[in-house]
């Protein structure tokens, strides 16, 4: 009989512990200073050296986050194919720009700097005006900066002391870009 009471008591204690764990709040809140929150929400490859939250969201939506860490060029090719096929829209186009720049910064491959500029330009000036970026979209300013920085790095002189504006055929990860440039057109 004592053994039965012991089992009952042990079962009761187990049930109370289980009930207490089930009633615990699974989510908590921690106070964070506003400037820390702002830096986290507005951080990008240009400001903190990591892709922005919108770009990370695209990687997760496409199940490419892990692949980008392991095989960035393959992940970029997959995302490029999704955009070209029409399965993904402007969010992925922006992500391609930022991720191409991020990869270029790590590898110093000019083709990826130029790709960042091409994707940023396509995001800023879409063929379909109904997909023009909202002037209040924080990605708009970042895309303009990615365009400028991508062009500057892609066309930098060998010693990177200046930008060498010139005509030519430039390699891209997904093809090539033909550029015609006439110095007489400069002001």
Predicted stretch roles:
Residues 14-17:
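Processing junctions and N-termini across compartments
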Residues 24-106, 110-182:
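N-terminal alpha-helical interaction modules that lie
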Residues 183-187:
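Extended, non-transmembrane interaction/recognition domains
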Residues 19-22:
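C-terminal motif of bacterial Sec signal peptides marking the signal peptidase cleavage site
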Residues 1-12:
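Bacterial N-terminal signal peptides that target proteins for export
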């Amino acid at each position: 009989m004592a053994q039965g009471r012991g089992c009952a008591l042990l079962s009761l204690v187990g049930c109370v512990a289980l009930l207490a764990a089930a009633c615990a709040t699974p989510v908590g809140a921690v106070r964070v200073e506003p400037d820390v929150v702002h830096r986290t929400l507005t951080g990008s490859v240009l400001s903190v050296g990591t892709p922005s939250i919108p770009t990370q969201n695209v990687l997760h939506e496409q199940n490419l986050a892990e692949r980008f860490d392991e095989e960035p060029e393959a992940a970029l090719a997959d995302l490029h194919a999704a955009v070209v096929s029409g399965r993904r829209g402007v969010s992925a186009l922006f992500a391609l720009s930022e991720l191409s720049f991020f990869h270029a910064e790590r590898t110093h491959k000019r083709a990826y700097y130029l790709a960042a500029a091409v994707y940023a330009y396509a995001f800023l000036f879409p063929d379909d005006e109904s997909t023009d970026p909202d002037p209040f979209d924080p990605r708009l300013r970042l895309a303009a900066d990615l365009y400028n920085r991508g062009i500057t790095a892609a066309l930098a002189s060998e010693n990177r002391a200046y930008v060498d504006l010139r005509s030519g055929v430039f390699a891209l990860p997904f093809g090539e870009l033909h550029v015609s440039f006439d110095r007489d057109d400069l002001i």
